[in-house]
C-alpha cells in the first residue's frame, strides 16, 4: 500500500477539527470605565459600531441563531487584519458563536477561569484576594472604588490597577467571541475610539 500525503482540503479539515477540540469558549471585551450619561453611552456605542463596520471588521449578522450565532454582528470582510496570523484562520469562519457584541448596558465583565488578582502599578504589590474580589460588588453597587496599596500607600481606582486577567465594570463595551488573538494595534485603536479610561477583559470558560 502506498501512502500519499493528504491533500489541502483534508489538511484544512484536520486543522478545523483540531481547532474545535483544542479551543474552549473565550472572549475579549474592551470596556469603557468612565461613567457616562445613558444617552452618551448609546451614542458612543453607535459611533464605535459604525467605525468597526465601516472599517470592515464587522457586519450585520445574517445567520442569527440563539444557540449558535447569537450576536448582532458577525466578522466582516477585513476581520483578518484585526487578528494575529495563525494556521486555523479558515476554521474560525466556521466556528459557532464567533460574533461581536457592542453592549450599551453597564455591567460586570469577568475573566471567569482566567481570573488573576491585580497588582499595584507603582510597586507591583499584589492585592489580597479578598480585597480584590470585594471590589467587584462595590464597583457594581456604588461605583468604582479607590484602593490604597498596603506596601507603598499609593492610591488608584481599581480599574487602573494592572491586571492581565482582571475584571471591569462599565459601558459601552465591545466583546469579541472566540476570535483569534487580537492585534495590539487594533485593540489600541478600539480603545481610542471608546475614549476615556478603558480596560481589556480576557475571559475563558
Q: Can you annotate each of these PLM segments?
A:
Residues 7-113:
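N-terminal alpha-helical interaction blocks
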Residues 135-147, 164-177:
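Short cysteine/histidine-rich metal-coordination sites, predominantly Zn2+-binding motifs
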Residues 120-123, 149-152:
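Short cysteine-rich clusters marking metal-coordination/redox-active sites
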Residues 126, 155:
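Cys/His-rich metal-chelating microdomains
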Residues 102-119, 137-144:
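Short, flexible, mixed-charge glycine/proline-rich loop motifs
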Residues 175-205:
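Long, contiguous alpha-helical scaffold regions
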Residues 129-130, 158-159:
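Short, non-ligating residues that shape and space the ligands of small metal-coordination modules
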Amino acid at each position: 500500500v502506498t501512502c500519499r500525503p493528504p491533500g489541502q482540503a483534508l489538511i484544512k479539515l484536520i486543522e478545523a477539527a483540531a481547532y474545535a477540540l483544542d479551543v474552549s469558549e473565550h472572549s475579549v471585551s474592551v470596556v469603557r470605565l468612565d461613567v457616562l450619561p445613558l444617552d452618551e453611552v448609546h451614542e458612543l456605542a453607535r459611533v464605535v459600531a459604525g467605525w468597526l463596520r465601516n472599517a470592515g471588521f464587522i457586519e450585520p449578522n445574517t445567520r442569527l441563531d440563539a444557540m449558535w450565532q447569537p450576536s448582532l454582528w458577525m466578522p466582516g470582510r477585513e476581520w483578518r487584519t484585526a487578528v494575529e496570523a495563525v494556521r486555523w484562520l479558515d476554521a474560525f469562519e466556521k466556528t459557532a458563536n464567533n460574533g461581536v457584541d457592542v453592549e450599551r448596558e453597564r455591567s460586570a465583565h469577568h475573566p471567569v477561569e482566567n481570573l488573576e488578582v491585580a497588582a499595584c502599578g507603582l510597586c507591583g504589590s499584589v492585592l489580597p484576594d479578598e480585597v480584590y474580589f470585594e471590589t467587584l460588588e462595590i464597583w457594581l453597587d456604588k461605583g468604582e472604588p479607590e484602593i490604597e496599596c498596603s506596601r507603598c500607600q499609593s492610591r488608584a481606582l481599581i480599574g487602573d490597577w494592572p491586571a492581565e486577567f482582571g475584571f471591569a465594570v462599565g459601558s459601552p463595551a465591545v466583546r469579541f467571541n472566540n476570535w483569534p488573538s487580537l492585534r495590539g494595534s487594533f485593540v489600541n485603536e478600539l480603545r481610542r475610539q471608546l475614549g476615556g479610561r478603558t480596560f481589556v477583559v480576557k475571559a475563558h470558560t
